[in-house]
Amino acid sequence: MNNLIKSKLELLPTSPGCYIHKDKNGTIIYVGKAKNLRNRVRSYFRGSHDTKTEALVSEIVDFEFIVTESNIEALLLEINLIKENKPKYNIMLKDDKSYPFIKITNERYPRLIITRQVKKDGGLYFGPYPDVGAANEIKRLLDRIFPFRKCTNPPSKVCFYYHIGQCMAHTICKKDEIYFKSMAQEVSDFLKGQDNKIIDELKGKMAAAAQTMEFERAAEYRDLIQAIGTLRTKQRVMAKDLQNRDVFGYYVDKGWMCVQVFFVRQGKLIERDVNLFPYFNDPDEDFLTYVGQFYQEKSHLVPNEVLIPQDIDEEAVKALVDSKILKPQRGEKKQLVNLAIKNARVSLEQKFNLLEKSVEKTQGAIENLGRLLQIPTPVRIESFDNSNIMGTSPVSAMVVFVNGKPSKKDYRKYKIKTVVGPDDYASMREVIRRRYGRVQREALTPPDLIVIDGGQGQVNIAKQVIQEELGLDIPIAGLQKNDKHQTHELLFGDPLEVVDLSRNSQEFFLLQRIQDEVHRFAITFHRQLRSKNSFSSQLDGIDGLGPKRKQNLMRHFKSLTKIKEASVDEIVEVGVPRAVAEAVQTKLNPQETEILLQVAEERVDYQTEGNHNKP
């Protein structure tokens, strides 16, 4: 805790409000709310905390606070601050998560469509549905029953669906607005589970078709009735009153919270939303923050009712959601909340069980690897791979695994500086020398094991640099691939020998992951560099096109291909002078330029020839 924080802690009021934690760069990393700012903020800097809170506190170098009139006002302010600043330690819902809805469009001749965007456009929306497959299944059924418009044909034509009774043919339709409203109401009733009327109508049509010997049409009506029955069985009825409601439940353990939301539509449970995240405040307060963020998402329509657990502040939720808020005491609504809580507990327990198994596997893998190689447990493993094509843009990459897991903040990329042509051995010598020369100079923590993606030659080069040049004592192993480019053999020892390693063991899978990751990282870096060099080289030598304009072109068009396809006017719009834009097109499209010149020359020749022939 620095002196600035110590001084500010003395100034904290006992009022409700929001506090804002910042890191060394002044970036907001956490926003919280409190009924008593003094007690809450001081608690971060006193006593011991769990690992995740320690990680947060270790980054705090400053904080600010905003006093509010009430706890509810603090809650609303907190949600807005989180939305605006997106702090990395706060609960952040996925922006791209949305559910499909079935929509009847607000048009003269309505259409039935599936959409993920809910707009105030006068359309009727039904849902959400668990996935687009479920929405499509229901829409296909509705299309067979209700003849909504499906085409955009000109006035003189009708579409195929008109001939099979699935389109009203707006080009010749004489129906009025009342007819369409009536049909929309029937769809609404159907989706609310009030489908007996439609089933009775279909049964009547089936009987009439059978009496007139139209057996194929009767079979179609029979299939429709069966499809409705199948749909009924897929949607579990959770409430007899057929209301739309969201049911919230949550469970906390070991510093983590799981929130489950059941979407009940027309009395049927159609989907659930699950989120697991670490919490830093009181669980009920972080739950309120979650609810506020949940209904800020455009894909979450506010239902008629929202059911919440008993220990949640009902008035606070009312301030967040414009809906009827209930804390049910008994009956089927209470059972729904209990079911949501139970599912939240199960989800959290599953997460911890999976984490424990994962830790056991990775910890066991590195311990077994250490025993196999007769070295201390390799907690930190650094792995290297080279990448080049015929010696062009040679690079090397290093990935780091700590306790069997990737530590991406420690990854490093290297442009090879001293090697000309395709020489893997010389490239490996350079990158090992650069990496561990720096480790030695700056007294960095050395790895417990170095893994080279390569065979005996590359490993021996690494050994020469590490042991003979730098005088370091770090175990070095090699991973050889087979002709299918798959992890095949582990090399270790002095002299190098193939280690007897079961291909079904956890340590083999760990080494395989390391080799795949370092190869991926090296290849990705090489492609980026090659693409950049290709882009630069093709635009080099154009007068008036410096690094800044090249950068602007790439930022605007995203690729060299798009620049080639762009017109001179489009390039000028990026801020490039017309003469330079023309030079860019000439350089990138030499064949097209030649053709244009030939056409121009032919036109001149033709005009000249015509002038000679004039009397």
Swiss-Prot record:
Which HAMAP family does the entry link to?
UvrC
- Coiled coil spans: none
Summary of the function given for this chain in its UniProt record: The UvrABC repair system catalyzes the recognition and processing of DNA lesions. UvrC both incises the 5' and 3' sides of the lesion. The N-terminal half is responsible for the 3' incision and the C-terminal half is responsible for the 5' incision.
Q: Which UniProt keywords apply?
A: Cytoplasm, DNA damage, DNA excision, DNA repair, Excision nuclease, SOS response
> Which protein are we looking at?
UvrABC system protein C
List cystine links.
Answer: none
| Keyword check for Cytoplasm | yes
UniProt subcellular location: Cytoplasm
Q: Name one GO biological process term.
A: nucleotide-excision repair
Where does the record place the UVR domain? 196-231
* Record domain GIY-YIG: where: 14-91
**Keyword Cell membrane set for record:** no
